């Protein structure tokens, strides 16, 4: 599968996505651009699947990507058990319309 470049060098893109995924799992919903939200959805769904696995290796893999240890704890103890009977599709993207400054399409991404 391909990926979006999001107009940044790879190190900046990775850092931005790690921050977005961490905040998304921390707060349960964030407002961002559509392209970023689609990337965040892909990564966060994989993180929730790791949380459902629940073993030590899965926890360490999540810690390698998510910046805040308390968010990993929340992922494994609160978020993942909520989706134990669901096979993917843990997130929802709602369109908001264009951003005032540059017209970029804004969306809300939230946990279902």
UniProtKB/Swiss-Prot annotation:
The keyword Cell division belongs to this UniProt entry's keyword annotation: no
Gene Ontology MF, one: structural constituent of ribosome
Keyword Transcription regulation set for record: no
InterPro entries attached to this UniProt entry: Ribosomal_bL17 (IPR000456), Ribosomal_bL17_CS (IPR047859), Ribosomal_bL17_sf (IPR036373)
Highest taxon above the source species: Bacteria
GO cellular component, one term: cytosolic large ribosomal subunit
Parts of the chain that traverse the membrane: none
SUPFAM superfamilies according to UniProt: Prokaryotic ribosomal protein L17
A Pfam family: Ribosomal_L17
Disulfide pattern: none
GO biological process terms held by the UniProt record: translation
UniProt keyword list: Ribonucleoprotein, Ribosomal protein
Subunit structure: Part of the 50S ribosomal subunit. Contacts protein L32.
UniProt similarity note: Belongs to the bacterial ribosomal protein bL17 family.
Protein's name in the database: Large ribosomal subunit protein bL17
Organism for this UniProt entry: Thermoanaerobacter pseudethanolicus (strain ATCC 33223 / 39E)
């Amino acid at each position: 599968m391909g990926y979006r470049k999001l107009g940044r060098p790879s190190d900046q893109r990775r850092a931005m996505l790690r921050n977005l995924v961490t905040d998304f799992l921390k707060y349960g919903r964030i407002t961002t651009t559509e392209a970023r939200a689609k990337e965040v959805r892909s990564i966060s769904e994989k993180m929730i699947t790791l949380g459902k696995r629940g073993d030590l290796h899965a926890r360490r893999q999540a810690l390698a990507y998510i910046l805040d240890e308390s968010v990993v704890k929340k992922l494994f103890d609160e978020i993942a058990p909520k989706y134990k009977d669901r096979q993917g599709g843990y997130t929802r993207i709602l369109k908001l319309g264009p951003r005032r400054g540059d017209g970029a399409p804004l969306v809300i991404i939230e946990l279902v």
